[in-house]
């Protein structure tokens, strides 16, 4: 797109009448306009989730994980805020990470489970391990310890390890959670999974 046409679009639609005094990266501006028009979720986007007791929490979209059905990887921050609080995105991302999980961020927006809050390109480390078991599911009340675990990093090769080595005990559960299940985890700090196997 011609830069002069782009400037005219910005003037007409965004009220930027004196572009000489505004420093911006043209490609970034075009990307933001395009993704906004397409309702696309950008890496670094931060979302607000209303949780019980008149509190709210935040998570950040990290990237897609080709190793798990191209699911959206999010990192959920630990702190809960009062409904009247207005933290900056810098304050939010400096918080401790509660968990990483896979979900469908755009679907959660459409369902009204969370709302866009802001964006920061700092998405933290992607050197995060996930784990999943091949024998998911058991009868109510039955305690299953799996010896069929697979582990992987975001967009990395999946590695079958059998009995889960201790070094992967802290790996996050690698399932593609529905937006409703993700919202439950963010709200209550636990997964709503009755039949997921244990590792020991």
Please provide the spans of the model-predicted regions.
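Compact, well-ordered interaction domains used in eukaryotic information-processing assemblies
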Residues: 62-67, 72-99, 105-109, 115
């Amino acid at each position: 797109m011609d830069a002069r046409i782009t400037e005219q679009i910005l003037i007409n639609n965004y009220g930027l009448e004196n572009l000489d005094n505004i420093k911006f990266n043209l490609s970034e501006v075009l990307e933001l306009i395009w993704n906004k028009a397409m309702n696309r979720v950008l890496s670094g986007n931060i979302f607000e989730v209303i949780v019980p007791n008149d509190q709210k929490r935040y998570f950040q979209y990290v990237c897609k994980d080709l190793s798990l059905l191209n699911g959206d990887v999010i990192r959920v921050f630990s702190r809960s805020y009062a409904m009247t609080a207005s933290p900056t995105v810098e304050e939010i991302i400096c918080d401790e990470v509660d968990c990483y999980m896979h979900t469908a961020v755009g679907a959660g927006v459409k369902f009204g489970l969370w709302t866009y809050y802001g964006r920061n390109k700092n998405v933290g480390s992607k050197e995060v391990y996930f784990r999943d078991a091949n024998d998911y599911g058991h009868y109510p009340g039955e305690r299953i310890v799996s010896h069929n675990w697979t582990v992987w990093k975001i967009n990395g090769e999946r590695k079958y390890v059998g009995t889960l080595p201790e070094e992967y005990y802290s790996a996050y559960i690698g399932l593609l959670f529905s937006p409703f299940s993700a919202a439950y985890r963010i709200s209550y700090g636990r997964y709503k999974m009755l039949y997921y196997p244990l590792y020991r």
